[in-house]
Amino acid sequence: FRAQGIGGNVVFVASKNGLAASPNAAAYCTAKAAEIHLARCLALEGAEAQIRVNVVNPDAVLRGSKIWTGSWKQERAEAYNMKTDELEEHYRKRSLLKRSVFPEDIAEAIYFLASEMSAKSTGNILNVDAGNAQSFTR
């Protein structure tokens, strides 16, 4: 971006776990927190060259996500002491808006941050989680 001299735009996709700790996920939470901090550092370093850097933080994306594959779904259900078919409703109910998060929601957030609609935004975190209070930006 710098060599081209025309600015640029980077959007990281991190996770709610970059802001909120979870049991048995220390490595994942730490990696996502580092990703968020890297984005903020790069926003500082790139601003003079008009390079914007922002972060999208999804939580519990209900389709096309690891949440619904392999043994992970069963492990999550067991951790919450429920059946696997109750898990989607659990994720919906724990959000403030009581709504599910889908891949399209994440794509729209990325599009927004990559577009001119957010031309004056850099170093920001956009949580796409239907209002998970655990991940309120602090």
Each predicted region: which residue ranges?
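Alpha-helical segment proximal to the catalytic Tyr-Lys
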Residues: 3, 44-45, 119
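Residue(s) in the substrate-gating loop at a strand-loop-helix junction
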Residues: 15
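Active-site helix of classical SDR
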Residues: 31, 39
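Short, small/polar-rich loop/turn modules that mediate ligand/substrate recognition or access, typified
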Residues: 47, 52, 121-123
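A glycine/serine/threonine-rich, flexible loop-to-helix segment
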Residues: 48, 61-94, 137-138
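Short C-terminal tail/terminal secondary-structure segment
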Residues: 110-111, 122-138
